[in-house]
């Protein structure tokens, strides 16, 4: 499924899409954290589906299908652990930490990629949670990547409301999607085609696939708005003196 991007959005459309995107990314971040009983109840009573469907429909013009959740919280948690933490024989389907996927490292050491992601976070005033706040964030966990996309969507909406140029935050969203979010979602969606035992909740399987499709369409939408993504190497080759200190995000 693809977002509707055939015509440039009006002011009101752009604001509505930014707010719907914020909701969708934030709901994704919630879903990919370790399951808690409140999330299971939201799956059972339909409130999680209702929230995703509202955002998804606003972005794509299509309803979001509802999957049947596990009846017991223990089954939801067991499926998540088997898929993403340690499955049968200690083998999970896929880690939710980007730094544990060689395909995403592209020959770089994990600390370097962590530093790159933290540069995004710091630029927009975010910091890592610490143990005295109840949890410790892993900056390369899929939930953190999706939460950051929600923050960028929120900032885009704020810029539109305030009459400011949303271009800088849109360029940041484009760069973050291309470099981190889309490849991570693509990898996990591909891996989840294989069954796990116990099975992963069908809502999470669908959400992974559909978030990847939305990430793809969002990259195309942003490219039309602020230009296509260019790697640091490409910028350096074309303008070596300026690229080293260029701030694309305002």
Swiss-Prot record:
Give the record's keywords alphabetically.
Answer: Chaperone, Cytoplasm
State its role.
May function as a system-specific chaperone protein essential for the assembly of an active dimethyl sulfide dehydrogenase DdhABC.
Task: Tell me any Pfam family this protein matches.
Answer: Nitrate_red_del
Can you supply one Gene Ontology CC term for this chain's record?
A: cytoplasm
State the residue spans of region: Disordered: 231-250
What SUPFAM superfamilies would the database entry show? TorD-like (SSF89155)
Q: Which top-level group of life is the source organism from? A: Bacteria
Give the record's family classification. Answer: Belongs to the type II DMSO reductase enzyme chaperone family.
Q: Can you name this protein?
A: Dimethyl sulfide dehydrogenase assembly chaperone protein
